[in-house]
Amino acid sequence: MNKKHGFPLTLTALAIATAFPAYAAQAGGATPDAAQTQSLKEITVRAAKVGRRSKEATGLGKIVKTSETLNKEQVLGIRDLTRYDPGVAVVEQGNGASGGYSIRGVDKNRVAVSVDGVAQIQAFTVQGSLSGYGGRGGSGAINEIEYENISTVEIDKGAGSSDHGSGALGGAVAFRTKEAADLISDGKSWGIQAKTAYGSKNRQFMKSLGAGFSKDGWEGLLIRTERQGRETRPHGDIADGVEYGIDRLDAFRQTYDIKRKTREPFFSVEGERESKPVAKLAGYGKYLNNQLNRWVKERIEQNQPLSAEEEAQVREAQARHENLSAQAYTGGGRILPDPMDYRSGSWLAKLGYRFGGRHYVGGVFEDTKQRYDIRDMTEKQYYGTDEAEKFRDKSGVYDGDDFRDGLYFVPNIEEWKGDKNLVRGIGLKYSRTKFIDEHHRRRRMGLLYRYENEAYSDNWADKAVLSFDKQGVATDNNTLKLNCAVYPAVDKSCRASADKPYSYDSSDRFHYREQHNVLNASFEKSLKNKWTKHHLTLGFGYDASKAISRPEQLSHNAARISESTGFDENNQDKYLLGKPEVVEGSVCGYIETLRSRKCVPRKINGSNIHISLNDRFSIGKYFDFSLGGRYDRKNFTTSEELVRSGRYVDRSWNSGILFKPNRHFSVSYRASSGFRTPSFQELFGIDIYHDYPKGWQRPALKSEKAANREIGLQWKGDFGFLEISSFRNRYTDMIAVADHKTKLPNQAGQLTEIDIRDYYNAQNMSLQGVNILGKIDWNGVYGKLPEGLYTTLAYNRIKPKSVSNRPGLSLRSYALDAVQPSRYVLGFGYDQPEGKWGANIMLTYSKGKNPDELAYLAGDQKRYSTKRASSSWSTADVSAYLNLKKRLTLRAAIYNIGNYRYVTWESLRQTAESTANRHGGDSNYGRYAAPGRNFSLALEMKF
């Protein structure tokens, strides 16, 4: 393990403990004086728990998880958070990172993600890399959340912009960070929590240490978490016995003329004393089949055997055959995923002061870094025999002793990518490698004022919160193309240099940053009379945002110029070989002439004002209601050409009714709406490779809209609870990439019809589904069964109803590939009543992906967003925990205990056209297989 990323938990724990010696001493020897009694009253303050019906009367579509739930489910990353929640999936981006969540048939920026009420970075995709090495130069990832900092997670399925604002079309995921009280045990004024965990599927090792205190009105916490891991390994059977045979090109010295039984003419280099044979391409099929092998056959037939030297040359002229393991093989048919090094580090600090019994003032600091360093192993490291034509016309002259320097190729650089002379040659002898580095950083600083009072008091508010947060999130995606380490070596740090003729390196980089300055205020008041109870919430907010995108592209090539100077005294060709010079270049120099694709920072400034009002009320004992609305006004401004700007005014609402005829049964109905203003990616628009007339502007975009309707039945009692709901969702004005025929003047001023590829409000779609959620307490069903024995069940099914495209557009994007196949999750478990130990088994069954949901029309042609759809699969997981003396908890789990081989749709979806970092040339889908039997271990300590 790299030591600079680690920290000793024991020493750090001691350091934090000694920082609060007085608090520890008081907890150990409490005295019954008045001051101590008052102190104990202060530290019992707890944040209000978030429930499924905290904001809305019905609770339909809501999932709430606490930090204890996350620990019990052994959540080590975003893919573990919703493992047992059908209908919620993670969007894989093909580069180790993720693009957010998929809920109710939509994903990415259509599912809002926030931390403490502050929106996280949008998924931003680069439309093609500048250097032209494929579509994986972009990112499309969002920053991930550090789960050791999280107190509660609220997952809201269905349109919910009245609560979460723009982006909550299919749903929202809202995180709340921990408070000092989350780290302090009851009756104490300080607390320390340490956790160490390991997951075998991606060899991730996590360690976290946190400390909190509360004394004399002051309270605070500090949490440090570090993670280190690798790529997720597929099922072990995938690579068992797999071996690849390759035939690669190389070079040989043509010393003999096999046909004439003579020595080939040599050449000489000015400044060198001895002449040398020319370097020729080994493995060139046309030469071997049409000439060399035929000449050898003729010599044998004529009883003119080859000399030992000639036989050696014939062998050297053949392709180099190698047998490679699944781990070593590179190319489109690779069966294993790309190797990845993952690291993250996070700090969370809070400090505040309570005064007057009802007031709290505090601050927060959060800093999280994540890095995903990948080698793209689908990039073929060698040059295969099918690439021989690239090298066949080279003279084969070289200086020194390394004859392989005489063979190189000049890449076919398209005109729009700039000066062709920037890349004059790439050598055959170098390994062809590609690395993708994805680095994220999120930093937040905030101030908070909170006023808390008893419910139904005569004061002006039961609770009031005023907060200001300053957040910056940056993603840095860099694609390195290297031809500078001699095959078979791989060296990520190598670069083109003058001592390596025809070496080459290229960096295709994209920076994206979002800044938010967010001011929020909320006021809560409870009222009641003889017949009704009301809980009113009034909210205001202002968000000043900025998005900055900046591409970079830079290459270096160490090429040489060889010039024939005639003949030497032996009548042999003589060459003057110039010393290699490193030529630095960038396609940005040419792209500067295209207004749509400049390699300079492009900025969009945004502002959003919102006001919301929500009332959760009851009439008598049979009816509960919720009714709320929100008004948003967004402005986007920019000085950039060909970047959209404008004002968007959106209104959203929610309503719910819960009828409870008795204490065991209830009927609920929920209706809500959602909206999404165009994302920064859509405002910037598609990067295009040709210019437009002065004054041309991109077509305006409208906000996307969503409508959600749900009806549910719920039974609850000593036996547990069961909820069955049916929902319908409709999405309108969905923004998609499409071609639209437009007439523009050409250079002669004549109108010419061309296809303009950009973002348009192109689609409407609707879907419906069923959701089941339940838990059975078997002791409540039959008293003789052990207390703590339970069964959980969850089911979700979504069925698309309609998809309609706007006339005149030829779509270039997916339709419904974000819809998760139907999934069943059934759990059986036992928790010892005193919490000393527990165990459970989770059974999951998923149907296959319906291929019809992958089809869309591009003009008159029917296309599919992926070549394959997943099949049905099932798996079983077992987990257990053991509490020792209330301070130590050991958790363990075995996943896919049957070692079943399967592929989830979420993983296979990485091959879809919507994936920013898609492996378009994959011919082997084994790399997307789920892990085989794997385990996780966690050790938690609380003091």
From Swiss-Prot:
GO BP, sorted A to Z: siderophore transmembrane transport
Coiled coil: none
Domain TBDR beta-barrel: 189-943
Membrane topology classification: Multi-pass membrane protein
Domain TBDR plug, chain residue ranges per copy: 52-178
Pfam families, per database record: Plug, TonB_dep_Rec_b-barrel
Keywords from the named record: Cell outer membrane, Ion transport, Iron, Iron transport, Membrane, Receptor, Signal, TonB box, Transmembrane, Transmembrane beta strand, Transport
Subcellular location: Cell outer membrane
Induction section of the entry: By iron starvation.
GO cellular component, one term: cell outer membrane
CDD domains found in the cross-reference section: ligand_gated_channel (cd01347)
InterPro entries attached to this UniProt entry: Plug_dom, Plug_dom_sf, TonB-dep_rcpt-like, TonB-dep_rcpt_b-brl, TonB_Hb/transfer/lactofer_rcpt, TonB_lacto/transferrin_rcpt, TonB_rcpt_b-brl_sf, TonB_rcpt_CS
Motif (TonB C-terminal box): 926-943
Signal peptide: 1-27
GO MF terms, alphabetically ordered: ferric iron transmembrane transporter activity; siderophore uptake transmembrane transporter activity
Family membership: Belongs to the TonB-dependent receptor family.
PANTHER family: TONB-DEPENDENT OUTER MEMBRANE RECEPTOR, TRANSFERRIN-BINDING PROTEIN A
NCBIfam families: TonB-hemlactrns, TonB-tbp-lbp
Record's function text: Unknown. May be an iron-siderophore receptor.
Protein name: Lactoferrin-binding protein A
